[in-house]
Amino acid sequence: MARKKLMRFKWNEEVHNLFQPEKENYKAYKGKWHEYFKNDNPVILEVGCGRAEYTTGLAALFPENNYIGLDIKGARLWKGSSLSIETGLTNTAFIRTKLQNLEEFFEPGEVKGIWITFPDPKPRESEAKLRLSGLRFMNIYRRLMPAGGKVFFKTDNRVLFDHTLEVLTDQTLKIKDLVFTHDLYQSPLLAEHYGIQTTYEKTYLNQGVQINYLKFEFLPL
């Protein structure tokens, strides 16, 4: 196991599509992701991407978009990075970072969409500011996206989901077209997921847990 982990760390250090602190170009593409991708296509993020099932799955389905997966764990990012290389995906990239540092990698208006897929619910009140669907992060997403930018959120955790719905009532966020379901797999909204499932999602479904999902769009500030 240790040998496999070392091989993955070495991959992360050498591969071109994964950005991490040890690399000189770690933050080089802020405001210039079109230079990395060599096109002006929309940039869509998967925050807390884990194994990056949505980053790679959506990238394969929609080559007209660029997808970037972000996570703090390099071992997780290895999966998306290596799969992208193996399958010839040129419209993906991966960044190892704490997600509160998003604005160090993107200029305001540079991001057109954000997927939040099964984040850690951070149930303690002392951890509230670390919830990826909390007000602190929603304000970060708001600054990164222009009017029309879309956020998509999936979780098995009903408490976190209901908290997120409450967060979205904050008038300073200025959102529209909020749509949600507490049971995605019994909803017409399921078609928007194109059969993509995360590892966590498969586990929860096997346990009979319902999946919550919402999406909305930002209005002009």
Swiss-Prot record:
The active site is at D120. GO terms for cellular component: tRNA methyltransferase complex. Substrate binds at D156. Keywords: Methyltransferase, S-adenosyl-L-methionine, Transferase, tRNA processing. GO terms for molecular function: tRNA (guanine(46)-N7)-methyltransferase activity. S-adenosyl-L-methionine binds at E46, D71, D120. It is an enzyme of class 2 (transferase). InterPro entries: SAM-dependent_MTases_sf, tRNA_(Gua-N-7)_MeTrfase_Trmb, tRNA_methyltr_TrmB_bact. It holds the Pfam family Methyltransf_4. Belongs to the class I-like SAM-binding methyltransferase superfamily. TrmB family. Catalyzes the formation of N(7)-methylguanine at position 46 (m7G46) in tRNA. This is tRNA (guanine-N(7)-)-methyltransferase. The gene is trmB.
